[in-house]
Amino acid sequence: SKLKEVWLAGGCFWGVEAYMARIYGVYDVTSGYANGNKDNPTYEEVSSGKTNFAETVHVLYDPDRVSLETLLTDFFKVIDPTSQNRQGNDVGNQYRSGIYYKNEKDKIVIDKVIKKQQEKYTSKISTENLPLKNFFLAEKYHQDYLEKNPNGYCHIDFSKLSDNKVTIDVKKYPRPSNEELKAKLTAVQYSVAVENNTEKAFTNEYASNVAAGLYVDVVTGEPLFSSIDKRSEERRVG
């Protein structure tokens, strides 16, 4: 319930989806079409340029771990915000850049980030800053495209995230005593976490879990990894 969302258009959504999914605090990313003039458009209809949809990714994130300002700042690293209806080699109104929101409070942050980004350019930023009118998921084959096709087309430079390092303050996650852990954990959890034993494969309650979220240390609660990093053929991860 505490997760927030924003919709970002930055050219071909394959690369934008994969890029945003790598940011710490992002739980899920899906590709789709935003702010067009018909229901349930197909990729071919969007590509025609007649529906006014923008290829867009829906970003679901935890504001306790990454701020909207940070997300947008990282987003601006990989787009040309002064280019109209074009990103990289992709040309057409479906490839325009945009930031779309539902919460009016988010617009304050978006305005702030755009104003700061404008200082870097002599040309006026043309990135849209609009309420989300509609959003439709793209076809299944577009989801996680670069994960399924590592050598597929991408206009995004992933090295732009090289300085996005995560640090965990371990002091915030003290280890309880064994007595406390025995009272808190199940027998299997205690055996694995404290006594260094192993559990039978695929018996853990999270083995087939498909919900977006953050996996934490059962002993201390320290963050370990995001559901984005969990791989499963049956689960589409952002």
Residue ranges and their predicted role:
Residues 1-236:
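Flexible coil/turn and secondary-structure edge motifs
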